[in-house]
Swiss-Prot record:
The gene is L2. The record marks G24, A25 as: Cleavage. Belongs to the adenoviridae histone-like nucleoprotein family. It comes from the Viruses. GO terms for cellular component: host cell; host cell nucleolus; viral capsid. It comes from Human adenovirus E serotype 4 (HAdV-4). Transmembrane segments: none annotated. The lineage of its organism: Viruses, Varidnaviria, Bamfordvirae, Preplasmiviricota, Tectiliviricetes. GO terms for molecular function: DNA binding. A motif (Nuclear localization signal) lies at residues 183-193. The keyword DNA-binding applies. Keywords: Acetylation, DNA-binding, Host nucleus, Host-virus interaction, Late protein, Phosphoprotein, Viral penetration into host nucleus, Virion, Virus entry into host cell. Coiled coil: none annotated. Pfam families: Adeno_VII. This is Pre-histone-like nucleoprotein. HAMAP family: ADV_PVII (MF_04056).
Length: 193
């Protein structure tokens, strides 16, 4: 004859697993209470869960959360004196940077004595070229009845001078003049000897 014992924690009938008696504890205590019912269980055929209607408290909480999410801190009032000082300092720094950059560029492209001599020669040529052009123009204006050859020579001289004064791209070769012994800048490449 078998004896049926009903345990108090509703795990089933009999003493199949004594360890399951009080939720794993050997004996019931305040530190390890037995959980009888965990959650609300609706009867079969009822709705899946309780539908709770929204309350005013829910709306207030939602509004507070939305405000916190969209919060942007107000900009601190900017002092006009500070702004003026900052702008003056930044302008001074920019000016100093530009000045040092100009100095660096000037140092990088410092001209040699040969380059300075070439520039002086070109300046002199331009000056004399302008004078010659003016002279040729005066001659052409005064001697309108002058011969065709003179007019042609004047225009040729004027074009040569203008082409000489116009800055041209290309190489400049320094050649020693046989008569004077001075180095002269020339555009055409000297023959190799």
């Amino acid at each position: 004859m078998s004896i049926f014992i009903s345990p108090s924690n509703n795990t089933g009938w009999g003493l199949r697993a004594p360890s399951k008696m009080y939720g794993g504890a050997x004996q019931r205590s305040t530190q390890h209470p037995v959980r009888v019912r965990g959650h609300f269980r609706a009867p079969w055929g009822a709705l899946k869960g309780r539908v709770r209607s929204r309350t005013t408290v829910d709306d207030v909480i939602d509004q507070v959360v939305a405000d916190a999410r969209n919060y942007t801190p107000a900009a601190a009032p900017v002092s006009t004196v500070d702004a003026v000082i900052d702008s003056v300092v930044s302008d001074a720094r920019r000016y100093a940077r530009a000045k040092s950059r100009r100095r660096r560029i000037a140092r990088r492209h410092r001209s040699t004595t040969a380059m300075r001599a070439a520039r002086a020669l070109l300046r002199r040529a331009r000056r004399t070229g302008r004078r010659a052009m003016l002279r040729a123009a005066r001659r052409a204006a005064s001697g309108a009845s002058a011969g065709r050859t003179r007019r042609r020579a004047a225009t040729a001289a004027a074009t040569a001078i203008s082409s000489m004064s116009r800055p041209r791209r290309g190489n400049v070769y320094w050649v020693r003049d046989x008569a004077t012994g001075v180095r002269v800048p020339v555009r055409t490449r000297p023959p190799r000897t």
